Each structure stands twice: as structure tokens, then as C-alpha cells.
Amino acid sequence: MKLQIIWLALVLIAVETYAVKQGKNVTIPALIVFGDSIMDTGNNNNLPTLLKCNFPPYGKDYPGGFATGRFSDGRVPSDLIAEKLGLVKTLPAYMNPYLKPHDLLKGVTFASGGTGYDPLTAKIMSVISVWDQLIYFKEYISKIKRHFGEEKAKDILEHSFFLVVSSSNDLAHTYLAQAHRYDRTSYANFLADSAVHFVRELHKLGARKIGVFSAVPVGCVPLQRTVFGGFFTRGCNQPLNNMAKQFNARLSPALDSLDKELDGVIIYINVYDTLFDMIQHPKKYGRF
């Protein structure tokens, strides 16, 4: 139940942020997602990595009760956002070998659990880097053109909602391997600059409505609290949360500038503050 509440919060923040910027009555033909495990619906299933969830007990609350590769007991935010936008109840993983051409029309997720903006993150985890996800996106658009024509591809590029969600694995894991090159602030800045570069590249490929998630309070995940939070208190790992906040502080104004510079809509989606408040004051959000 706790995870479902958090998932729902992410969905509402993402959709409402988009609606405020774009308007509530805009028709969205598809949802296209890039990122990590929060949005992965099974892209890791056939990769040579330990980071996969296509086995029990994962999926026990998913329709049919079977594991699909989602890093969850049930659906994940990419599914819920797609449903909230009136598209599909479950967003397909692009790497699913059984996808048919018509399955591509309402959108897909390229997200790969364990990845990040730092290319080293995907290399360490043997998963799909966000940069390789862009290569698969180009392949996706080529398939749309081949099966449904140039006009449909143009419609998807210009009017779909493109969502980018990453940084947690970089901050929580890869920084330790990069500490000889960066201090905490400069690494967070490097990640934010990489995120902005990713958005630029996505825009070059034709995407015009792009939302980018902030970093989450990754210092509050159970592993960080257990290892670094104190034996009795199990508090959040504050230095790690400070890195996440530094990432956000650099990313938000950079995306605002990019939104003014480029045609289309580019939005920063702040999920950090709401999630941190839920963690610190759970009773405000009901019993769960």
C-alpha cells in the first residue's frame, strides 16, 4: 500500500504539472518514457543483467498475478500516467519481442532499471543507458513511419508527452566510483548538465512536449536509512539528499532556460518536495 500511495503521488504530480503548462484539453496521442526502474515495464527481461524482476514475488498484484519485469508488485508510474492520460492501462516495454506494430501507437517505455545519466551507471549494471534509449527511440520512429506513415510519426513527435526519469542510481551508487573525479556538488552538477543535454538531443529528434522528473529524496530509501541512518533512528542519508537537491537546483533553471530557447514545451516536474514531505509526515497523507 505504501508503494501504491507513492506511485500515485508521482503520477498526479507529473500529470498536473503537464496540464498546468499545456492545458487540460490537449489531445495526447502517446506517452514516450525514458529512464530507470521507476518507469521500466520489462526492458531488462532479456538483458545479461541481475537487475530484472520477471519472477515471483514481483507482479503478485499485477492483472493476472504474474511477473512482467516491472520493479513492483503491480503497475508502475509509466502505466498509471498512461492510464491517467487516457491512453492505455499498461505501457509496453519497447524491448518486448512480442510487440506488434499497433502496440506502438499509444506509446512505449524505453526505461531500463538500474540506468542513469552517467554512462558509467549503465555499464556497471549491464543495462540500457539513457543514451542508448535514444537510439531505440529513433528505431521506434522509423517503425511508426514504415507501418503508419510520415504524418502519424509527425503527430506522435509533435503532440505526445515525453517523460524523462533518472538520476537515483547515479547518485546512490555510481558516485562512489566517481568520487576520485568529482566532489558531491560537481557530480550532481554533471548529472544535471547531462540531463539537459539529453533533453536537447531528444528535441533534435523531434520531441516537442518534454517533462523531466527531479531527483527524488534517494537518501531516504530503506537501504540508505539502514546503512547510513543510525542504528536506532534510521534517519535519511542527508549528504545523499543534499546531492539530490543540488541536482534539482541546477536542473530546474536550466530547463526553464531551455523551454524559452527551444520551440515546444519543456517542463521540470518537482517530485522531491512532495515525496520528502510524505516520508517526514506520513500521517498527513492518511493511514498507509
Curated annotation (Swiss-Prot):
Coiled-coil segments on the chain, per record: none
UniProt keyword Mitochondrion present: no
InterPro entries from the UniProt entry: GDSL, GDSL_lipolytic_enzyme, Lipase_GDSL_AS, SGNH_hydro_sf, SGNH_plant_lipase-like
UniProt keyword Ribosomal protein present: no
Active-site residue list: 37 (nucleophile)
Range of residues in the leader sequence: 1-19
Superkingdom: Eukaryota
A GO BP entry: lipid catabolic process
Gene3D superfamilies: SGNH hydrolase (3.40.50.1110)
Glycosylated residues in this chain: 25
EC assignment: 3.1.1.-
Transmembrane segments annotated in the record for this chain: none
UniProt entry keywords in alphabetical sequence: Glycoprotein, Hydrolase, Lipid degradation, Lipid metabolism, Secreted, Signal
GO cellular component assignments: extracellular region
Molecular-function annotations in GO: lipase activity
Pfam families the record matches: Lipase_GDSL
Main location: secreted
Localization in the cell: Secreted
Stored PANTHER family: BNAA02G25900D PROTEIN, GDSL ESTERASE/LIPASE EXL3
Family membership: Belongs to the 'GDSL' lipolytic enzyme family.
Protein name: GDSL esterase/lipase At3g43550
